[in-house]
Amino acid sequence: MDAEICKNFLLVREKFPDQLNSDGKYTFKDEYFKDYCTGGCDNDFKKINAGCLYFFDAFFKDSSLFEKVAKNNINIVDYIIIWLSYMLSLMESELKESLVFFYNIYIKGGERYTNTISGINEYSSYMELISKKHDLTNVDMNKSIISELYDAFKILCEMYTEFDKNSNCTSCSEKAKEFVKKYEQLNGNYSITGNSSYNKMLSSLSTDYNKLKDKYKDSSSLPAIKSTQITSSSSIANNLLLVLSIFGAIGIFLGIAYKYSLFGFRKRFKKQQIREKLKNIKKKMNQ
C-alpha cells in the first residue's frame, strides 16, 4: 500500500460515487470509465464492472505495472474486492447473490478478466488473481460488515495520502485512533474472524497500517493495534455446548457402568445362593 495506490481509489470515488443518488441509482460523474463499459454501462452491474476493470488495469495490466505497483502490494486485490462488495451491497438484493452473479457473468464470463496478463508468470489473468485470494462463488458476505471494512479501508487510505503530503500530519493521529478502534471491533467479532475472506481483508488492513506506523514513527506517534480476545456469544455458546456434551457423555458412561456393576453384583449373589442350597442338599443326603 502507498499513497499512489490510494489516489486511484480516491479517483474512482470522485468519478463513481460510493453512494446512490436521490433516485437510488449509481451514477458516473463523467465519461471517465467509457473505455470499460460494455453495452454503454446501461445497468448497475455494468457500471460496477467498469470501476472494477479500471482498478485491475491500473495495477495489473502488464508486466511493467505489475513490477512497479502490484508485485509488492498484492493486497490490492483484497481492497478491490472490498470496494466491489461494498458497491454491490448498495443494491436491494442479497450481497451473496449479487457477488455470485457478478462473478459468473462479468469475471468468469468476461474476456477482459480471463485474458492473459502480458509478461507475468505468477498470475495468468485477473480472474486468477481474484480466485487465489477469494472464492466469490462460495463466500458469505454481510452488508453491514462489508460497510465497516470499507470504512476502515477509506480511513487507512486517507492517512496514506495525508502523510504523503505532510509527514507531520496532525489530523492523522485522530484518524489512526478511529481506524484502530474500528479494526479491533471487527477483529473481535467471531462471525468475522471465522470467515476466510474477512480474515484476509483484516490481515491486509493491519499489515498496511503497521507499515504506515513504522514509516512515520519518528514524526508521528500512532497507536498500536492490540490483539483482541474473541468473546462473542456464539463462541461462548459453542464452548458451553462442548462442555455440556462432555458431561453428558460422562453421565451416560457412568450410568451404563453402574447398571452393569449392579447386574454383576446380582448375578454373583444368585450364584452364592445356589451354592448354599447345594451345600444344604448334600448335608441332608449325608445324614
Model-predicted regions and their roles:
Residues 1-231, 235:
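N-terminal targeting/regulatory segments, especially signal peptides of secretory
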